[in-house]
Amino acid sequence: MVSITDLAKEKLAELSGKEIEIPLIINGEEVKTGNIGTCVMPHDHGHVLAHFHQAGEPEVQQAIESSLNAWKSWSKTHLQERADVLLKAADLLAGPWRNTLNASTMLNMSKNAYQAEIDAACELIDFWRFNPYFAQEIHNQNPMYSPDGTRNSSEHR
């Protein structure tokens, strides 16, 4: 029987044996600028983990424009649908992505297994689960009464 610890060790060995290329993602598409930075292990500067494409002013402007365009539809998306995105991500992180997140945190931030589990996996899963709950609570508290001449409300974007 393979234990969770064995799977975590396998993922750590797999990721530490790779050098990956990280593009920018703008409007859902990979962008490779050719302006490359290097990501090394903080505890072993000779061990390269990744080469990443750095954004310049044109890429930053494209990302801003893309974000503003995405906001138009996202802000009109029902609260439950938006919550479902975070809840699905939390489920994936709590399950099949957990070892990948923990291993990458250990390698890129010099955390031990316990620190990675608490600081990366547990906290992020909690945030992705708590925030939809609290958003719904805020949504439910929209005032029913407003004094004459005013209208109290919350707009959830």
Pin down the residues of each PLM region:
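Hydrophobic face of amphipathic alpha-helices that form TPR/SEL1-like repeat modules
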Residues: M1-L49
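Conserved small-residue-rich beta-alpha loop and adjacent elements
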Residues: E137-R157
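A glycine-rich phosphate-binding loop feature that marks nucleotide/adenosyl-phosphate handling sites
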Residues: E29-E30, L86-A89, C122, M144-R151
